């Protein structure tokens, strides 16, 4: 019997439902409150509803965050809702999340060689469902790797624009035959993960942190598209608070992604680290 996730009252998966049942995520008041909070939005941002776009999503986003809707975005940073999904454009660049680009990393035996998967692999073989929280989701690529390995992942993204792009990417992935099994293990919440972690009752296996590092310089053609995202995301200014919230949540392990030569997050030395050519994963076992 294959098990599918059911969410408890704190949004964390419970793998105790057989595949003849359907589950729906319960929206608890705390999460609703987080979703309703108006986050800082780029002043020049506008919303555009293109042909075949989901008008209800576009209007709900514009109303919640006080962003104007326009048919002629011009040079402004534009969040477009059209038949292809949700995309961001501006500064001569455009970006839309697409997990199809990740398929080559999770097929043909490559997944086991991913550093993050090696860091997140349980030390003992477990029969239970693995659960993770990605507290700084961004566009969800790392969460996709965890979900491909078998984790039920709750992704938190505080920036409303990035969260809208991420939710759309997950929605489209769930309609893709090759991606849907992985995407069904990903649940996106727009809000402050510190608030969520401080109220978490049931511990998870992994809490993953990848706060934006202010000194990291990204180059290359692919990353030019991500420059749009970086214009919206601010470097983490509350590293101590974020790390303390993760500690208080009492996971089995905290994994922190860092540039190879960067100092440890909040000055906390890890239990061990996995080093790559440009990045490392600091692992804190509880």
Region roles according to the model:
Residues 239-285:
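Conserved Class I SAM-dependent methyltransferase catalytic core
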Residues 132-145, 204-220:
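Conserved proline-anchored active-site loop of SAM-dependent methyltransferases
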Residues 30-130, 159, 163-202:
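S-adenosyl-L-methionine
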Residues 212-242:
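Mobile active-site "lid"/loop adjacent to the S-adenosyl-L-methionine
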Residues 152-157:
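Conserved SAM-binding motif I beta-strand of class I
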């Amino acid at each position: 019997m294959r098990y599918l996730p059911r969410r408890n009252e704190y949004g964390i998966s419970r793998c105790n439902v057989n595949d003849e049942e359907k589950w729906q995520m319960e929206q608890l008041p705390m999460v609703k409150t987080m979703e309703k909070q108006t986050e800082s939005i780029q002043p020049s941002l506008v919303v555009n509803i293109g042909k075949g776009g989901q008008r209800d999503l576009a209007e709900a986003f514009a109303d919640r965050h006080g962003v104007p809707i326009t048919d002629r975005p011009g040079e402004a940073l534009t969040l477009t809702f059209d038949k292809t999904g949700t995309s961001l454009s501006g500064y001569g660049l455009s970006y839309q999340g697409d997990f199809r680009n990740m398929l080559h990393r999770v097929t043909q035996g490559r997944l086991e060689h991913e550093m993050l998967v090696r860091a997140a692999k349980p030390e003992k073989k477990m029969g239970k469902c693995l659960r993770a929280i990605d507290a700084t989701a961004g566009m969800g690529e790392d969460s996709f790797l965890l979900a491909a390995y078998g984790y039920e992942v709750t992704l938190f993204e505080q920036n409303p624009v990035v969260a809208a792009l991420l939710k759309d990417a997950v929605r489209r992935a769930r309609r893709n035959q090759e991606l849907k099994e992985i995407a069904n293990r990903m649940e996106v919440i727009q809000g402050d993960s510190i608030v969520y972690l401080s109220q978490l009752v049931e511990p998870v296996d992994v809490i993953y942190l990848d706060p934006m590092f202010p000194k990291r310089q990204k180059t290359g053609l692919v990353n030019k598209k991500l420059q749009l995202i970086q214009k919206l995301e601010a470097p983490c200014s509350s590293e101590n608070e974020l790390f303390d919230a993760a500690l208080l949540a009492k996971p089995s392990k905290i994994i922190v992604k860092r540039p190879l030569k960067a100092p440890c997050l909040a000055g906390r030395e890890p239990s061990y680290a996995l080093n790559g050519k440009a990045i490392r994963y600091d692992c804190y076992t509880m």
